[in-house]
Amino acid sequence: MMRQERSHTKVIATIGPITRNKEILEKLIHEGVDVFRVNLSHDLHEEHLKTITYIKELNEELGSNVAILGDLQGPKLRVGDMEDDKVMLEDGQEFSFVSTPCTGTTEKAFLSYERLPTDVSVGERILVDDGKLIFEVTGSNLTDTVTCRVIAGGPLSSKKGVNLPQTKISQPSLTEKDIKDALFLLDHHVDWLALSFVRKEKDILDLRKIVEAHPNNARIIAKIEKPEALEEIEGIISASDAVMVARGDLGVEVDFHKVPLIQKDIIKKCHNKSKPVILATSFASALVGVGLVIMLSIICVATITGFDFI
C-alpha cells in the first residue's frame, strides 16, 4: 500500500513485455521500486496475471511490500492501421477521419470514436501522435466522416494516439473495457486502480461503486490529463484516494507552458486534503542517451515540488 509520509519521493515502475520477468522484477525491487504499474491499455489479462503473480510471489519470498497499480485505459482514442504502416501527410492538404473501420491512406484514417462526427465542431483541432500532427476540422456529415485541413503534417503511423483538446467528448470516462478490466484486477487483489482521462467527480464515483460492490478493496487514483478535469479538480481530489498528473497527455491538451503551474496548484490542493500526488511521464524513453545527471535532476524537481510518487 502506498505510504504518505514524505521521507522521500517513491518510485512507480511500469511493467511491459521486457520487464515481465520474475528475475527482472526482483532486481527492480532491490533497486527501490515501491509500486509496480500494469497498463491495461495493452496485452491480455493472462499476461497481466503473470505479472501480478510474480509480484505477489516476490513479496512473499523477499518480505517486501511492493504495491500493484492497475491502470485502466479509459476512452483513449487512436487511429487504425495505416497503409504500409505509415503514410506521409502534407501541410494544407485535405484529410478525413472516419468511424467505419478501414485501412488508412493519405486521404483518410479510421478513428476509434464513433461519436466524433457529432461531438466535434468546425474550427476545432484534432491532434495525433502527441501533437506532432495537427488537423483543423472543416466539416462533418454527422454520421461517419469528419473532414479536416492538415495544419502540421508528417508521418502518420498505425495506432497513434489522438487528442481532442477543444472538443467536449460525450463518451464516458469509464468504458465497458474499463469495467471488465477493473473486475479482473479486483479479483486478483491489486492495491490501486487508476482511471484515465477523468473529466469530472462522477467518473471517480462510478468506479467507486464497482469497487465497493466487490469483496476485494482497492484504492482509486484519478489521472488528470484532460482540461475538463481542472474545472472540477476539487471534487475529483475529494472523491479519489490519490491523484496522478499525467504530464504527457495534459501537455498535449493544454498549452505545455501552463503545465508547471497546473501541477503546482494540484499538488497544493492534494496536500491540503492529505491525498498523495503522483508525477507521471515517460522517464525511461525521455532519458535514453541523456544520462544520470538529468535523471537525478528530474527526481530532485519532483521531490522539491511536492510529488509523493514518480
Model-based region annotation:
Residues 1-310:
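Non-catalytic helical/linker scaffolds that mediate oligomerization, partner binding
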